[in-house]
């Protein structure tokens, strides 16, 4: 009998495959980070002003959250010890679920340890073989993977094209239809037309799953999210909408939740494998998030400051981008996409900013479509007016590189 004492032979292919990623500027690299003050970080030993964090309200380093985490650890310890349906559902986690449901004004909430696991779990719990799922072309990877895992028939409609979505819904013979969409699209920052999505789901008897990872805490009255901003809360919303949001962005901590009607949340509790078979999040995190919800609810000044920084950046870049092939998207949110195009040019822009002490990540395919590599500028209430002015000045310094790459008639 043949034996193979060494590593599997197919692993020999991996160095060449990694080299292929290098050749097309697609290999990802991690940075080692330590927080300093405000939006400033120590990145691989270098001080940087960061425009890459999803900590939109600047709460991740808030003393009230640190105090709540310490108090939670003293009360409950640091681990949950089991899955939620065995021994891991602490009093703190139960209280957080009640607080989350109240905050987003829906009947019931279910708390998960991670956003990615939430969507990859709840989608297969809702639809399966023989059912129809309708997905925006620019949805986040977790919704895409959840759709694939469900084995439902997937209908992918062009980004934001709700006429195309309606045609697909009208043509579908499936009894169970699920529409899934980001509320705020993570790489462009644009906001879905939630009212029209809801109306289409009512018209065609579909359920709407809305992923508000980048809107929760920032959009809507008192930061209650994109669904509340659209005026969809309470009983009417819960009959047709399943609302999902993450807690590691504007909330400043970690985890995620889904909220909806009593019966829908009970079904997900019974059928979501990523909830049933995963160790529950520790109670100290729930206590942290309860403190965060209070800060979000009282955080109108933070949101106003963030809105001012968004307006400052957008106004400041208008003259900078004139005559270049770089394009700033139309986002009104904290996610601002500066589309550059080629992978190598986006990487060069990122490195030029790093040399100036600014950390703005270059996002490349497959995260974004081919030919749309970009700088993803993430703004935060932790940024000052001077911080944003510094970024605008730095982009003005490096933008001529883009102009020089244009044909003469385009650069004129």
UniProtKB/Swiss-Prot annotation:
Pfam families: Aminotran_1_2
Binding site for pyridoxal 5'-phosphate: 115-116, 186, 214, 246
Recorded metabolic or biological pathway in which this protein acts: Cofactor biosynthesis; biotin biosynthesis
Catalytic activity annotation: 6-carboxyhexanoyl-[ACP] + L-alanine + H(+) = (8S)-8-amino-7-oxononanoate + holo-[ACP] + CO2
Biological processes annotated in GO: biotin biosynthetic process
EC number in record: 2.3.1.47
Function according to Swiss-Prot or TrEMBL: Catalyzes the decarboxylative condensation of pimeloyl-[acyl-carrier protein] and L-alanine to produce 8-amino-7-oxononanoate (AON), [acyl-carrier protein], and carbon dioxide.
Protein name as catalogued: 8-amino-7-oxononanoate synthase
The species this protein was found in: Paracidovorax citrulli (strain AAC00-1) (Acidovorax citrulli)
Higher taxonomy: Bacteria, Pseudomonadati, Pseudomonadota, Betaproteobacteria, Burkholderiales
The gene coding this protein: bioF
